[in-house]
Amino acid sequence: LLKEIIDKEEPKIIILLGEARSYSLLSFEVIAINELSNKADNSGFIPKTNKIIEKGPDGIFATLNYQLFEETFNKTKTKFKRSYSAGTYVCNSLMYQTLNYLKAANKTTECGFIHLPDLNKQSLSEIVNGLNEYILSLIDNN
């Protein structure tokens, strides 16, 4: 479905979002790895392989503008961290498959993943403010 939407809409930017309840801060994910956890997802599905894409690259770096992310979040005083592991679960799989598709299809779309923390640890208004400003900055730069 995501591939179909990408092909139809031809976005310049894709920001993937997911929740990481163990995180205390919003996190910019730098890389997705070609690895799956063997634990069940919310629907009960358990992968039969440890690879997301059998002959895919071991890792694929986000192409979202991190420097702009850092500048924007510092300007808005939104706390964040730079993360070098999107995990081995659903969020990482989504990030990996999306980046892999964009690369294979020779698309120039900027793409990355941002993990949202437990909202008891960082306020929703702080997160929304930072993300809004970042999205506006990305639009201005494209």
Regions found by a protein language model. Name each.
Residues 27, 94-95, 125-126:
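A short secondary-structure junction signal
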Residues 113-125:
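A structured phosphate/pyrophosphate-recognition subdomain
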Residues 87-91:
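Polyanion-binding loop/helix "lid" in catalytic or ligand-binding cores
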Residues 1-86, 99-108, 129-142:
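N-terminal catalytic or cofactor-binding beta/alpha core of small enzyme domains
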Residues 92, 96-100:
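Short, hydrophobic/amphipathic alpha-helical patches that form generic packing surfaces
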